[in-house]
Amino acid sequence: MIALEIALEKPNRRVWCLDGDGAALMHLGALPVIAQRKPANLIHVVINNAAHETVGGMPVCEGGLCAAKVASAVGYPRVLNARDEATLETALQEAKGANQLTMLEVACAVGARADLGRPTTTPIQNRDALMAFLREEKA
């Protein structure tokens, strides 16, 4: 919902929302609200590994979540899928050129880099950095 509000408040900025499939499933009620508001500058990317990676890779649900089908069902006007590097590149180019609310579902495998560290900033520092960024006027 943060990305939706940013997109509505900053209609001249392209807003990319990155979501995991587990997070999208837990906040499923947000999708119809976003679809109803239809911000043309919002690209909603769902990274779908069919698992809650941050809690040990527990499966999200039997058979996984098809975020693209859910987005289409609730009214997202443009829905794209990427299943490999080639389709990802094509879908990203399409999403960049879209002038309408777009969902891009990206399939990937469960797993993280072994050298992936923990955040080095606090949630308050992250909030302050985001607020400062949003106050900047970009051409």
Segments predicted by a language model, with ranges:
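Conserved thiamine diphosphate
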Residues: 58-94
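Short active-site-adjacent structural elements
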Residues: 53-55, 90-91, 111-117
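Thiamine diphosphate
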Residues: 1-49
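General beta-strand structural signal in soluble alpha/beta enzymes
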Residues: 17, 80-82, 106
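Conserved beta-strand scaffold positions in the cores of enzyme catalytic domains, especially
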Residues: 44, 79-81, 103
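Glycine/aspartate-rich loop-and-adjacent alpha/beta segment that forms the canonical ThDP
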Residues: 98-139
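Long, charge-dense
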Residues: 47-57
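Short, solvent-exposed amphipathic alpha-helical segments in soluble enzyme
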Residues: 32-36, 61, 96-97, 120-124
